[in-house]
Amino acid sequence: MDATSRFLIVVGVDGSEPSLAALQWAVDEAKLRGGKVRVITAWHYPPVPSTVEDSGSNDSFHAAERLQSDALAAVAAEGTDITGMLVRDAPATALMDAAKDADLLIVGSRGHGGFAGLLLGSVSSHVAHHASCPVLIVRPGNRA
């Protein structure tokens, strides 16, 4: 980060409780550092025939758009520079790509697909091991 750039935090949001806790943490951290937040919402679905894919694509896109819009609205009054990006890709890939120029990547401990007994989900585990920047994994309710 050079003297003219602002601390960039990338955060993954899928609408789950851990991801919303990660978003709040990102906003709080950006306020402390005078930074900005880039919210990534990814959607990915298995390949299917094109006629069904087109319909599923629109449904998936609109669902992702709605949940990101709701998440951004929940933190809009916080006075932080926040932008959102909807990405059609696997969540881990989307986050890794979006965080290439980031100073910090924040994710929830588990997303919607997580098994209740696991401490980390597959996305948080993958980015923790492969991201090119520091990664913070947030569990709901674990705020200092």
Predicted segments with their positions:
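Glycine-rich, Arg-bearing micro-motifs that act as flexible, cationic patches
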Residues: 107-130, 140, 144
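A short acidic, glycine-rich active-site loop
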Residues: 55-67
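Anion (oxyanion) recognition and catalysis
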Residues: 31, 76, 129
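Structural beta-alpha unit
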Residues: 1-5, 18, 73-105, 142-144
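Small/aliphatic-rich secondary-structure junction motif
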Residues: 2-53, 98
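General small-molecule cofactor/ligand-binding pocket signal
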Residues: 38-40, 83-87, 136
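A conserved short alpha-helical segment within the catalytic HATPase_c
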Residues: 68-72
